Regions:
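Cap/lid segment of the alpha/beta-hydrolase catalytic domain
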Residues: 372-498, 502-503, 508, 530, ...
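Bacterial Sec-dependent signal peptides at the C-terminal "C-region" and cleavage site
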Residues: 19-32
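Active-site-proximal cap/loop segments of hydrolase catalytic domains
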Residues: 453-686
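Gram-negative bacterial Sec-dependent N-terminal signal peptides
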Residues: 2-22
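Beta-propeller domains
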Residues: 62-88
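Mature N-terminal segment immediately following signal peptide/propeptide cleavage
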Residues: 30-67, 71-72
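Conserved beta-strand positions that form and line the central face of beta-propeller blades
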Residues: 41, 82-86, 132, 180, ...
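Peripheral, non-catalytic segments that deliver or gate enzyme domains
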Residues: 45-49, 67-72, 89-95, 100-395, ...
Length: 686
């Protein structure tokens, strides 16, 4: 017979547990006191973005919407209020544009439906006419050179003759006439031209994954100039020539770990170190627009820092850095170097653009990219260094919701659900700065952790090369180690972590739910590959120069051993292990990760009666460029995560309006999705 005291203790414990469970607030409850930021403010069209100035200082330009579609606007430099749209895109929108040195002429790139077959267009501001300079089907234009000495022409690489390799043409901006400069029969990956459009240097990939740097010989033939071993090929490359052709800049990690910038005297071959940093590779540069001489170099370890190498601009950069505690970048400098267009961003503030009058030393605020976010409860981002299980340092970025960090000190006061947001590439990196996804997720009640796992770039070649052969291996271990760090720091608990990402981040999501099926509460895969064999067998043809690197870093699909390895590391192989909710987003025109990658794993899950929600956009590619589609997918994601992690969710409402969203499978898996689709009229715009 049980002792009465034991029975009483058991009853008291049960009641206490029930009361505790009932009292535990959800992530949505805890964030309820913070104003909800509308998805439209975060993911709709920016009011103004990509602000530039023409080289002659005559015009100010930016990208802004016309009837909901992004186009290029131009205004007199001294009167932005007189701006007018100079492009008339009515479908996908224009995001990438730049000025030529020809007065009154700008250029822009546009593809169709995300297929990445980019055409190059020239716009004559006097006539308002746009001309397609690359009017060839299935051709991807690559801008190879612009020169103030030849303002009426531009160098363009085109692969219309051979889909794998780009020939180089000089193109007349007014007529569109192209003149062949180099028929690429030598399988050249890229060229460097001087200011007179003479091709001086080139780079060619080798079967061992390394590369040869070539120089034009006296007889006009290419001859070997330098050798880049495979282990250095992602961190070593020739940069550009100064306008006087006397100096070649070269980023180089050979004989060292982090990539440094060198200046090579073309006549003597003497190499001079310009800048190095033991923590991180050198990044962007600021060059004198009249000479091409490098004046400052950026290094991004925890934060992006500008290192001055020419004292002539030291005072200028000090003035820019005084804008605030965030990061600054220089978008454009006029040819006379009197005016700079500067972008300033902090994690808790979207981009703000300034005009810098260099002779006067004064800054004038121009525009905020997203003024709708001014005064909204945006939160800081905290750079952190996380130790992996084998003692590698994983530079990462933590964003905490106000419900977990009321005093904004970067230390969690109580655990909240966490979204592990994995970057794509994987040969890329996460950096400090404003991120719409980080702010969105934090505003819904989640902590967000972005991790630079091994294989990421920017931290030296050893860290990048440590990812070779480690898809679903040590690269994934790094993500798991980062989650454990967050648990130990009190940011979250083991049972309330979601994984989410695009491209490689989508693969990491699928790997997380298949290779480690108990590690995550749910996953959001955006254009992620599920089958590494089919991924590598369907890459775009113009990736030929990069393919040997892919084979060495991932696995070689041309060999039996490589196929076996790739099969073992493919989430599709382990689809039967999925037991947590999965949301998949895919663009039907993706040239990198084909729609079949998502189709395959969805079909495998259906065959095993495993639930999945599959969202497909017929007018998108590798990611969702149209704001209508991006908002639509994020509306679905928000409901999905709220169901999984308990954060708050703004109703789908009208966020499908104008989008091409379709849900072939699993519309009933996300609250409100099936109902929202019933009244939706699909709008496909390529």
């Amino acid at each position: 017979m049980r002792h009465p005291a034991s029975r009483l203790t058991l009853l008291a414990s049960t009641v206490a547990f029930a009361l505790a469970a009932q009292a535990a607030p959800s992530a949505a409850d805890r964030i309820a006191g913070t104003e909800l930021i509308a998805r439209d403010a975060l993911f709709g069209n920016p009011e103004r973005a990509n602000v530039q100035m023409s080289p002659d200082g005559k015009y100010l330009s930016w990208v802004a919407a016309v009837d909901g579609v992004l186009n290029v606007w131009v205004a007199p430099a001294d009167n932005p209020a007189q701006a007018k749209a100079v492009t008339q895109d009515k479908a996908r929108g224009i995001r990438s544009y730049f000025w030529s040195y020809q007065p009154d002429t700008l250029l822009y790139l546009r593809d169709s439906g995300g297929d990445e077959d980019f055409h190059l267009y020239a716009v004559d501001l006097k006539t308002g006419q746009a001309k397609d300079l690359t009017p060839f089907p299935k051709t991807t234009a690559q801008v190879a050179g612009l020169s103030p000495k030849h303002p009426g022409t531009i160098l363009v690489g085109m692969n219309d003759r051979d889909a794998q390799w780009h020939d180089v043409y000089k193109v007349d901006l007014a007529s569109g006439t192209r003149t062949l400069l180099e028929k690429n029969d030598a399988q050249i990956a890229g060229y460097i031209a001087d200011a007179d459009y003479t091709l001086k240097y080139a780079q060619r990939s080798r079967p061992d994954g390394g590369a040869d740097v070539l120089r034009r010989g006296a007889n006009g033939a290419w001859e070997k100039f330098d050798d880049i071993p495979f282990e250095d090929v992602l961190t070593t490359s020739p940069g550009g020539l100064t306008l006087d052709r006397r100096t070649l800049y070269f980023t180089d990690s050979r004989g060292r770990n982090t990539a440094a910038l060198f200046a090579i005297d073309v006549a003597s071959g003497k190499r001079t170190l310009v800048l190095e940093d033991a923590r991180a590779d050198v990044g962007g540069t600021l060059a004198d627009p009249a000479t091409g001489k490098v004046q400052a170099v950026s290094v991004d370890y925890l934060r992006d820092e500008w290192k001055v190498v020419d004292p002539a601009i030291r005072a200028d950069l000090q003035k820019l850095e005084a804008i605030g505690p965030g990061d600054v970048s220089v978008n454009t400098r006029t040819l006379d170097d009197k005016t700079w267009i500067v972008a300033y961003s902090a994690a808790e503030a979207p981009l703000v653009y300034y005009r810098y009058d260099r002779p006067a030393g004064t800054l004038t605020k121009l525009f905020s990219a997203r003024p709708k976010l001014e005064g909204k409860p945006l939160v800081p981002q905290w750079p952190v260094e996380i130790a992996s299980r084998d003692n590698k340092t994983l530079v990462s970025y933590l964003t905490l919701p106000r419900s977990a960090d009321a005093d904004s000190d970067g230390k969690a006061e109580a655990p909240v659900p966490l979204v592990l947001l994995v970057h794509g590439g994987p040969w890329a990196r996460d950096s400090y700065g404003y991120g719409s996804y980080n702010q969105w997720l934090a505003n819904r009640g989640y902590a967000v952790l972005s991790v630079n796992f091994r294989g990421s770039t920017g931290f030296g070649k050893a860290f990048t090369n440590a990812g070779n052969g480690e898809w679903a291996g040590k690269m994934h271990d790094d993500l798991l180690d980062a989650v454990q760090w967050a648990v130990k720091q009190g940011v979250t608990t083991q049972d309330q972590v979601a994984i989410m990402g695009g491209s490689y981040g989508g693969y990491a999501t699928l790997a997380g739910l298949t290779f480690t099926p108990d590690a995550f509460a749910c996953g959001v895969d955006i254009v992620g590959p599920s089958n590494l064999n089919t991924l590598l067998s369907t890459v775009p043809p113009y990736w030929a120069s990069f393919f040997e690197q892919l084979a060495k870093r991932m696995g070689d699909p041309r060999t039996d051993a490589g196929k076996k390895w790739l099969t073992e590391r493919s989430p599709l192989t382990r689809a039967d292990q999925i037991k947590k909710p999965l949301l998949i987003g895919q663009g039907a025109n993706d040239p990198r990760v084909k729609q079949a990658e998502s189709d395959q794993i969805v079909k495998a899950m259906q065959a095993r009666n495993i639930p999945v929600t599959y969202v497909l956009f017929p007018d998108e590619g590798h990611g969702f460029a149209r704001p209508e589609n991006n908002k639509a997918f994020n509306a679905v994601t928000e409901g999905f995560l709220a169901q999984c992690l308990g954060g708050r969710a703004e109703p789908i409402g009208k966020d499908f309006t104008g989008s091409s969203i379709s849900v072939p499978v699993g519309a009933d898996g996300v609250p409100g999705l099936a109902e929202a689709l019933k009244g939706h009229t699909q709008e496909v715009k390529k």
